């Protein structure tokens, strides 16, 4: 695993409100000779090993174990003091990476629905029963507890949503302008004139072309999604 990726995940878990110095107190190593460098050490589970990563063997096995009541994808719930370092075998680094990257969609490439999408009911969060839980946020709180347990002062996590970005997928911006749409129009007995008008006419006459209305709705004083 590249140091840049590791640093990003640790920083992501710790949170932007936490000083950078605290990130350096967290180690991701199985080498006991390096434990003394850190306040908290997370033991790698082997998920990122070259022979395992990207293969079906890297996928979590059900049922999942738990660490302090939180579903754990990789590692074990074992926690212990090794001299002055709090060492945990719960690999929340790999678990977080798996969840935020949608890693399983890469490994299970052949599993897609009729639209080419990964089926939600095949996802690990659904099959493991934690689809309704913000597991990565719970990992963050857990990591903060570990840091405090190692006698570090960690700011409280601010419970707020900073920004929400609304997106809208438009699968078919027009109904009749494609060749399939033209055939559909003729099949629906709209007549040849209207069918060809739908194919080659102005966009404003296509019933699916509602972007001006949508933009007006979105920029109104009380925008609503529909």
Q: Across the structure, where does each feature detected by a protein language model lie?
A:
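N-terminal accessory beta-strand-rich subdomains and adjacent acidic, glycine-rich linkers
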Residues: 1-151
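Histidine-centered catalytic/metal-binding microenvironments
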Residues: 126, 130, 156-162
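Short amphipathic alpha-helices and their capping/turn segments at secondary-structure boundaries
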Residues: 150-160, 212-217
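Conserved, mostly hydrophobic/aromatic
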Residues: 169
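Aromatic- and acidic-residue-enriched segments that line the glycan-binding/catalytic groove
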Residues: 174-190
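Aromatic- and glycine-enriched glycan-recognition loops and surfaces
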Residues: 195-217
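Conserved small/polar residues in nucleotide/adenosyl-binding loops
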Residues: 218-225
């Amino acid at each position: 695993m590249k140091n840049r990726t590791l640093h990003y995940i640790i920083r992501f878990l710790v949170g932007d409100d936490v000083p950078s110095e605290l990130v350096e107190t967290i180690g991701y190593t199985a080498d006991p000779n390096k434990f003394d460098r850190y306040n908290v050490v997370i033991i790698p589970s082997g998920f990122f090993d070259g022979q395992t990563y990207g293969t079906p063997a890297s996928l979590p096995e059900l049922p999942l174990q738990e660490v302090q009541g939180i579903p754990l994808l990789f590692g074990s719930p074992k926690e212990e003091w090794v001299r002055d370092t709090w060492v945990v075998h719960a690999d929340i680094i790999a678990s977080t990476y798996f969840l935020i990257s949608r890693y399983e969609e890469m490994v299970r490439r052949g599993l897609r629905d009729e639209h080419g999408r990964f089926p939600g009911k095949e996802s690990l969060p659904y099959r493991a029963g934690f689809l309704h839980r913000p597991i990565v946020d719970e990992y963050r709180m857990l990591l903060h507890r570990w840091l405090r347990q190692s006698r570090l002062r960690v700011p409280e996590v601010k419970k707020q949503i900073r920004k929400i970005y609304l997106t809208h997928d438009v699968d078919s911006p027009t109904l009749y302008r494609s060749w399939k749409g033209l055939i559909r129009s003729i099949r629906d007995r709209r007549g040849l004139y209207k069918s060809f008008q739908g194919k080659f006419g102005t966009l404003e006459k296509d019933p699916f072309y509602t972007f001006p209305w949508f933009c007006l709705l979105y920029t109104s004083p009380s925008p609503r999604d529909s």
